[in-house]
């Protein structure tokens, strides 16, 4: 588990832990955090006002308990999965480790790092009946006896069952690993993210069900009600 900022055996983590690997993500066709959470006991998804990840840890809603390689990542957006080695979901008291504002759980994304001495690559593509599709690539190459470069990229079209809904996500993440000495490893990472989507907050409900006569109605201006994200993220 990497959520504690250093690799820790699962048996030594003082919370309940669920780990979803890159292989699991690819086999199940997960495209966002909400897809993973649906298969995790004790955790549910919340709407997030149609423009951000929102998770309910054991009954407590949170939009801030997200981490990236052990560092807080509480920006309000939908997180991509294309460059992840695994997703770690911790449930239980965590104020001592993650701050007194913790809700009783966190989600930590562990990114892929370059692998020295190996060359490999893969391309994945998918689509659904609503017209959505995604393409992702992962390529690792040795750049020397003690260094390697790895590049991950993806593009998503986010069409769904709502006729007026649309969205696009693009991500590019090169990483460099250098073995400085037997005791020192340097990992450098740059990530570019460009997201745009319509903010769909759903339709009104009555008696616990959506009001059918509103299912074709757009609540908001289709040209103005947009979420955009452009980010340049550097890690070392």
Residue ranges of model-derived segments:
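Outer-membrane beta-barrel translocator/receptor signature
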Residues: 82-85, 96-174, 180-184
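Short secondary-structure transition/capping segments
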Residues: 57-61, 162-164, 199-200
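Short strand-loop junctions, especially beta-strand C-caps/beta-turns
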Residues: 23, 71, 126, 156-158, ...
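Residues in well-ordered beta-strands of folded domains
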Residues: 58, 108-110, 124, 214-219
């Amino acid at each position: 588990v990497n959520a504690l900022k250093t690799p820790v055996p699962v048996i030594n983590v003082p919370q309940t832990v669920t780990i979803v690997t890159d292989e699991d993500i690819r086999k199940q066709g997960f495209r966002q955090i909400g897809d993973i959470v649906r298969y995790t006991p004790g955790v549910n998804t919340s709407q997030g006002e149609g423009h951000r990840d929102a998770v309910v840890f054991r009954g407590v809603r949170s939009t801030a308990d997200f981490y990236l390689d052990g560092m807080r990542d509480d920006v309000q957006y939908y997180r991509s999965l294309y460059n992840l080695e695994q997703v770690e979901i911790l449930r239980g008291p965590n104020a001592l480790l993650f701050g007194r504002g913790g809700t009783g759980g966190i989600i930590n994304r562990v990114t892929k790092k370059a692998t020295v001495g190996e060359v490999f690559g893969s391309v994945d593509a998918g689509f659904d009946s609503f017209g959505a599709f995604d393409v992702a690539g992962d390529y690792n190459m040795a750049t020397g006896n003690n260094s390697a470069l790895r590049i991950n990229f993806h593009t998503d079209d986010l069409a769904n069952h709502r006729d007026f809904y649309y969205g696009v996500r693009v991500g590019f993440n090169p990483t460099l690993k250098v073995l400085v000495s037997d005791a020192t490893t340097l990992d450098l990472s740059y990530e570019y993210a460009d997201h745009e989507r319509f903010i769909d907050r759903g339709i009104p409900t009555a008696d616990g069900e959506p009001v059918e006569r509103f299912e074709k109605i757009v609540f908001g201006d289709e040209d103005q009600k947009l979420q955009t994200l452009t980010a340049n993220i550097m890690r070392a």
